[in-house]
Amino acid sequence: MVQSAPASEIAALILRGFDAYREQFREITDGARARFEQAQWQEAQRASAQRINLYEEKVAETVAGLRAGLADSELLDVERWPIIKSAYIAQIDLRLDDELAETWFNSIFCGLFSHDNISDGTMFVHTTRPSLRAHARAPYTRTYRPGGDLRQALEKIFDDYRFDVPYDDRERDLERIDALLHSNLPDWVCKDPDLAIELIGSVFYRNKGAYLVGRLFTPDEQWPLVFPLLHREGHGIQFDTVITDEAEVSIIFSFTRSYFMVDVPVPAELVAFLKRLLPGKHLAELYTSIGFYKQGKSEFYRALINHLATTDDRFVMAPGVRGMVMSVFTLPGFNTVFKIIKDRFNPSKSVDHATVIQKYQLVKNHDRVGRLADTQQFADFRFPVSKFEPECLAELLEVAPSTVVVEGDVVLIRHCWTERRMTPLNIYLENASEAQTREALNDYGLAIKQLAAANIFPGDMLLKNFGVTRHGRVVFYDYDEICYLTEVNFRYIPEPRFPEDEMSSEPWYSVGPNDVFPEEFPRFLFVDLDQRRLFAKLHGNLYDAKYWQGLQQQIREGKVIDVFPYRRQETPEQLLK
């Protein structure tokens, strides 16, 4: 039975939904330690997907509860929502996750209203929370002061971060990490009496790895510090390496990786700490990396509207070959592309709009192994017409008139995805040196292999569908033909029956909808003969159906293959010689 409710009660109902979401989020996250200790790798993948889907499930549940308990005339009176927002602000004021609570409020509002009603009066378009709150914080880091004895500090770290599974070889790992730190850092650092090591108290879990994250610092300098840990089944926990290079740590927190599972009592505090380690990362990316992808979306949107308000930047079509399914535009000064689905696809494409959306959701939920760009989905973006170059707007209106609409002096984009901008691999290779070409083509092959190991087949593997990041990594970003590797039927081309068969424009053999012939890859992927020959030397096994069938067999047997987000260093024996 519907009834009247004061604004404070509606605010409390919204907050109750948020509490239910946060409780279940923490429950899934807290299970990461046990999954790591028990080597439950498939369960870890399922938990990751479950946590991603949790947000929308709980928003829908909360919206349904509000609709069931309140009259539409009361709930959908937009004039009341500034009062509800004020009541909500008072209720979240002392929370340690208040910025997440604001984003939750926005999600509930958008679940009830069309985007026509968005304003800072009814929603948190801009946050009301200061970036650093003055109230008490829970202690979040552990600090170690070697005082010239780095080995002793490392022993204390090993003691403080114990698991219910023993270390495989504690003494070996201590020697290795000590040697690596002396090797990676300037000579004077490890001897500096003022050197300190600060580590986040919570362990970061993802896929088959666990990570201790922090920094080394002196009064004048600092270095990021990451200890990756592995659980070798039947052997125990081992410290795999140590990373102190900012670029390598940045890759571990990349937009191409799955989200970490990490206990986060105070999200803003953890993000601020990570920002000090990785100043090149935007807040949006850091929130997203620790599982708060909706907060990442809020931070991204705020950065976008600020950029548009404070610069003369205008939208242009993204460089590269025009897509058959998606149209892509960008802001030159904002490191993002915006992707919309065209109204009509090239006849060679067999997908429809619903399938494309499903493919993007598949990527969102799957382990991206550092080779798939994360995306954010937006509805009803509104931008001034003046922020578009005329040629860009004309092309968008031509290819997607059902998605892009001009309403007076505003451009409405009904649906789009945002994605990190990269240099298309085909364009990168046009200007690459011989060494850069070799490195890029090698990484291109590694990207395909690592995706395959994660049960992902890109489908359309043309160079134009891969991008090169600022760190030089090759990443796949065209998802309309992506599928699970185990769905593909890899075949050898049958021998021709007659000499005439080889001259025919049509195949002399039947081809099913999921059939793929790796022998055709060289001609299909490379027009440039030098690149074709080089790739055959680097990754020729990709042209053999047996290679793909072998991976499929391992996946069907339940094996989760190792893909490391960092360069693995020398063995202890090599390093300690």
UniProtKB/Swiss-Prot annotation:
Entry-linked InterPro entries: AceK_kinase, AceK_regulatory, Isocitrate_DH_AceK
Subcellular location: Cytoplasm
Any one GO molecular-function label of the UniProt entry: phosphoprotein phosphatase activity
Documented EC number(s): 2.7.11.5, 3.1.3.-
Record: residues binding ATP: A318, P319, G320, V321, R322, G323, M324, K339
Active-site annotation: D374
Single biological process term from Gene Ontology: glyoxylate cycle
GO cellular component: cytoplasm
General function of this protein: Bifunctional enzyme which can phosphorylate or dephosphorylate isocitrate dehydrogenase (IDH) on a specific serine residue. This is a regulatory mechanism which enables bacteria to bypass the Krebs cycle via the glyoxylate shunt in response to the source of carbon. When bacteria are grown on glucose, IDH is fully active and unphosphorylated, but when grown on acetate or ethanol, the activity of IDH declines drastically concomitant with its phosphorylation.
Family, per entry: Belongs to the AceK family.
Name of the protein in question: Isocitrate dehydrogenase kinase/phosphatase
Species of provenance: Pseudomonas paraeruginosa (strain DSM 24068 / PA7) (Pseudomonas aeruginosa (strain PA7))
Gene: aceK
